[in-house]
């Protein structure tokens, strides 16, 4: 499996966990297929599905493929060690082997992303927005609020789980590191942070290149790119 460094383990489902005593922070890369199953009740909607994380079953006309809408990780935090722990999801970012950098998207950014799909019509709660479009937007926002990793303190003997969402990782990236900076684990008597942790978790991807015909590798040797998996040295 992967060589993740000290205090890290890799589970059978691909979750990489950082452990410090009885504090555990885990990341699991999610495939579009897994996310579609998670919201399978919306699968029949295709590209109009309220599932906010994928394009569902819709395909691109010219290639017949379903593009990746976002790169998604299931993040978990289990705190049985400290009085309270704080992980700021907006500060999580990805660096890649070829120099790219991706910051986690917050709810407001994702809501803005989906508002651009609302076009014309009348009705709904906003002027010029159709009732159906407004309903779809609110469904997506509701799912995001219920399933994204929440920006809040995790007290002793509590656990927190939710999705971290990024723009799609470029197809030429074969190695990436997820950085979780400044996880606060101790506070002074005034409530100010006095001790924090910086967590880095590494993944590898099997990737190809985008060719003029739209394939990810030449048609003579076609191989689809995979979502991130724990990297192996």
Language model feature labels by segment:
Residues 1-233:
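Conserved functional micro-motifs across diverse proteins
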């Amino acid at each position: 499996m992967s060589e993740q460094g000290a205090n890290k383990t890799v589970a059978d489902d691909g979750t990489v966990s950082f452990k410090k005593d009885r504090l555990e922070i885990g990341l699991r890369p999610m495939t579009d297929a897994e996310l579609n199953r998670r919201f399978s009740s919306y699968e029949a909607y295709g590209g109009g599905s309220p599932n906010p994380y994928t394009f569902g079953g819709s395909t691109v006309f010219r290639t017949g493929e379903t593009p990746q809408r976002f790169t998604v990780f299931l993040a978990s935090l289990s705190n049985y060690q400290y009085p309270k722990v704080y992980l700021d999801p907006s500060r999580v970012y990805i660096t890649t082997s070829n120099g790219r950098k991706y910051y986690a998207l917050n709810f407001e950014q994702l809501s803005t992303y989906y508002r651009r799909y609302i076009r014309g019509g009348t009705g709904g709660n906003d002027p010029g927005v159709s009732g159906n479009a407004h309903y779809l937007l609110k469904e997506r926002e509701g799912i995001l609020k219920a399933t994204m990793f929440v920006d809040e303190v995790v007290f002793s003997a509590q656990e927190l789980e939710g999705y971290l969402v990024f723009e799609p990782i470029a197809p030429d990236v074969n190695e990436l590191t997820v950085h979780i900076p400044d996880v606060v684990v101790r506070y002074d008597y005034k409530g100010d942070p006095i001790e924090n942790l910086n967590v880095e978790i590494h993944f590898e991807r099997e990737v190809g290149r985008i060719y003029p015909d739209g394939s990810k590798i030449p048609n003579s040797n076609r191989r689809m790119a995979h979502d991130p998996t724990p990297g192996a040295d």
